[in-house]
Amino acid sequence: MDKATLRHEVSNNLTLLEEELRSFAANVGAGLWRKSVANLYYAAYDATCALLWSKGIKAESHEGAQSMLSLHFVKAGAMPKGTTKNLSLLLSLRHSADYKGDVSISAQDVLEQRKWVIGFVKSAMDIIGAGSLGISATAVLTALKDAERVAIKEHGEGGGRS
């Protein structure tokens, strides 16, 4: 695969990542914890796909992305050992948020997941930035800072619904 194609695919995933982070900030502001969890998962997934594309690897599924992330980044030592486990837990939480109305999703859940996702995305951007594709992640880093700064408050404090 040529560099132009890889740059294009990584950039596409970074655009999706930026949009998820911006949507996350808006959903947190509205107190929509379920949507916030989904945004966090998709931000992590889009960062994963961008990482994989930076090595010329196309993920065919969410599970495939996790497997390839583990093989090419975790086992290689570029990402911490718990990365794939955290991504899997976040996927499970996203499934609950999207499909199980009887499962409560709280501001605390969002706070905990945000911390991990922010660290993961920062690491992914460092790896992509250190690569040879010459891709700028400025928009993602700006959206990441906004996602990190947005206040997460419980129902009575921030309004909205879970």
What are these regions (language model features)?
Residues 1-162:
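Terminal alpha-helical segments
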